[in-house]
Amino acid sequence: MAIIFSFGLIADDHTEPNYSKFQANYFFSCPNEPACGAAFDKMMNSPDIKEQKYEAALSRINLQGYTNITHSINFYYKSAERFQEASEIFSSSPAFAVFGQEMAAAGAQPYYHNLTSYLIAEGDGRGANYGVTFVTEVSNPVVYFNAFKKMAAKMFEESFGGEAYLLRQQHTGGGNVTHSVSVYFNSNAEALDFLANYPNTSQFAQFVEEAGTSFKPVRTYMEQALLQYNPD
């Protein structure tokens, strides 16, 4: 899956979110969003791919500081076996080959990809299609995780606190990046309200005090889910 390219907490009939174990995330630039979206949708609805019922999403990436990243494609896998199976299926799929050709014709350029796993999840973000992601370098995971979990649980007390908080570990890709945190919202306005207010909360002040020097911020970006498949 070298040429295909954070998101996926979407409403369904489950009582609780059914989070994936592994997430394969592909970041790229696309100057023609409709064409890239059409290429991805065509592949996901091709018979050989559709029958696999992969959970996946195409998202727009905003305000992340790099002009060569505009979108991401994310696949969510419940097990290592499912991930391995998908790699084999995509490598031999005619629809995947066509997808690569159509993305290239649309001017898409891959930037980087990584593999992540969820470590901590607070709240229920199904149906919340807007997110803010904080990418970090964590040097002391135990200290950082405990501080984050406390903050996330209490941040829901705020009117701008969002719907869900996810902490991911990054297994591959991204240089010194080790983890990322995403907060999900029902609208872009809610995400902006959060960004404007969270630094002034007692919850964040406590997090900074407890986390201390256990982490270094790397970058922050906003995202919006555009296309979603088989949400779980």
Summary of predicted features, one role per range:
Residues 1-6:
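Bacterial N-terminal signal peptides
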Residues 7-205, 210-232:
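Short S/T/G/P-rich N-terminal loop/turn motif that feeds into the first structured element of a domain
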